[in-house]
């Protein structure tokens, strides 16, 4: 090795060490602060959820909660806020995620859950984490490239604190931005921040999201064929969910210009549907129904009604997330299909959860890791088969309109197009 080569090697090593320590520091800051925010947010969501169950009349306050949400967004000049799409765009094109988005989405999501809106929490976590990550980047005076990494780092930390799946949380933040491209420069800070955040959540008594799959069938040709057929249905459900969510939102905005009237109507519709269908199963995130779907088979209409309730809620302007409702749709569809195909209910619910999640996010690696963190390694032969097929067959639909499809799902081809 000559002197010039040695000098270059030393310079690269020096840069790597400096970069490592920089991101170690940032990961600890993000993991501790954003993880704490996420954990407290999780505790607050649990509290307002229990209040809603204890006091069913709170459902009638949903239109009022909607008015408050619209007012808050207007007063801080975030009326046109695009939610998670804004965070994704910020990483793609250096847009800013204002710090005020974090408290705004937290309060709005709490109001939505308190009064029975059908919404999740992880979409809110991505926005909170992204906004706080962007704030730290400004505080540290980072350039545009490092700001992107800090946003992803924040997303990983908050998602991990709320969901308790640190590896999937870290990978999701890097994978969801552009389909076919992984932002590996963010790997170290995202992984470290996610583990720190999950540790803080555990210290506060929050348990990781985990489901027990009691029975595993043999991975035979016949059973494999059954799961292939189910995967087609999971992919179709993914497409339907995206179409319903986006279509409902468009209907609201096309026919009701006033956001206050729009959200009041949405709240009234949720109240009406609760009494029309005679159940509270579709209010809130629906975690209890997901857990139940692993034990007993669900009716055929359960996943469809959750789609409807969620679309009416989020499309009208209420806040929260789409991910837990997505898992609800997948789990209950898989649970319904299990007896039809003569397969274990829990295993089919597990495959449905991660397959529909993959179909609407276009994140197969995250989906596979999520399956291992939530169900254990015993299910992975079945889940990876369903995930792969759902990814292929769900086309270019996505929960997030700003998500870029960089590489084709069907050929080794650069296409760089927006999702549906």
Model-derived features: positions:
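Alpha-helical transmembrane segments and immediately membrane-proximal extracytoplasmic
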Residues: 1-420
């Amino acid at each position: 090795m000559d002197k010039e080569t040695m000098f270059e090697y030393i310079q690269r090593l020096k840069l790597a060490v400096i970069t490592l320590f920089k991101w170690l520091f940032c990961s600890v800051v993000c993991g501790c602060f954003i993880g704490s925010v996420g954990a407290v947010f999780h505790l607050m969501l649990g509290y307002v959820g229990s209040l809603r169950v204890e006091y069913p009349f709170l459902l009638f306050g949903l239109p009022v909660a909607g008015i408050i949400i619209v007012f808050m967004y207007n007063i801080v000049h975030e009326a046109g806020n695009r939610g998670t799409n804004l965070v994704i765009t910020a990483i793609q094109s250096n847009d800013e995620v204002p710090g005020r988005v974090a408290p705004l989405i937290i309060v709005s999501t709490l109001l939505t859950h308190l009064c029975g809106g059908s919404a999740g929490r992880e979409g809110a976590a991505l926005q909170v984490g992204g906004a706080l990550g962007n704030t730290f980047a400004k505080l540290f005076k980072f350039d545009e490239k490092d700001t992107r990494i800090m946003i992803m780092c924040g997303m990983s930390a908050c998602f991990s604190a709320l969901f308790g799946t640190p590896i999937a949380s870290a990978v999701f933040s890097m994978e969801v931005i552009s389909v076919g491209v992984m932002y590996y420069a963010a790997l170290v800070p995202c992984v470290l921040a996610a583990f720190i955040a999950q540790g803080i959540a555990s210290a506060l008594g929050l348990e990781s999201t985990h489901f027990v799959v009691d029975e595993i069938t043999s991975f035979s040709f016949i059973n494999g064929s059954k799961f292939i057929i189910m995967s087609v249905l999971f992919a179709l459900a993914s497409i339907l969910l995206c179409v319903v969510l986006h279509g409902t939102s468009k209907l609201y905005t096309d026919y009701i210009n006033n956001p206050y009237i729009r959200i009041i109507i949405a709240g009234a519709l949720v109240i009406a549907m609760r009494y029309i269908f005679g159940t509270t199963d579709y209010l809130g995130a629906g975690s209890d129904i997901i857990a139940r779907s692993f034990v007993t088979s669900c009716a055929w209409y359960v996943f469809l009604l959750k789609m409807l309730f969620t679309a009416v809620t989020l499309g009208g302007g209420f806040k929260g997330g789409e991910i837990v409702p997505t898992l609800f749709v997948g789990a209950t569809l898989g649970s319904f299909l299990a007896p039809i195909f003569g397969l274990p209910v829990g295993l089919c619910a597990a495959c449905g959860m991660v397959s529909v999640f993959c179909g609407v996010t276009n994140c197969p690696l995250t989906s596979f890791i999520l399956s291992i963190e939530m169900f254990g390694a015993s299910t992975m032969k079945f889940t990876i088969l369903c995930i792969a097929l759902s990814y292929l067959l769900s086309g270019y639909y996505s929960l997030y309109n700003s998500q870029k499809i960089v590489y084709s799902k069907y050929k080794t081809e650069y296409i760089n197009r927006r999702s549906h």
